[in-house]
Amino acid sequence: IRELIKEGGEWQRFVPYDFEGCKPSFTRQAGREMLFKLCTASREDFLALPDCDEHLANRFMSVVSSCPETMDIFEQRIKSKNITMARVRRMILHLVLGIRKDDIRQVPYGRILAFNRTGTRILAQAENRTLEYDTSLKKLEDISDYAKRVAFLEKNAVRLRETAAYGRCVSNEYTRKITIT
């Protein structure tokens, strides 16, 4: 599907609902912003990342000091036989979004972004659930301090996606409408 989107192909038939008005985006489109964040990060910032150790933090700092011109160059310089590209990209996204080791815990809530009739029935029958579900980000972030932190990170992810797609933030997660299919 990603390749179809990149090439301008017919990808819509492979997704469950209409994405009208929602421009597809890829992290590459925010490459300059991401590279800036990487090049201004400290060793401590890298050490705070999930899945980062002393060796990787040193490797990141070494690449930062070489002033790579693009994200592709940055990633290639980090990647090695023992460090996969997927891991490198995940760590970069964690840094850009502000996700730290202590953020990776139990899921604090389930946010409903879209549903159909079947989903409506399932939610109505789920009386003894242990996880809070809602469509309102405001209600969900009021569950706990940790839920508020996760909601903040969720908003960061939306801002990154919108910056990549539109060059700026265009929506408010507190007023976002859910999709009913």
Residue positions per predicted region:
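Active-site cores that bind ATP or allylic diphosphates and position pyrophosphate for catalysis
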Residues: R2-T181
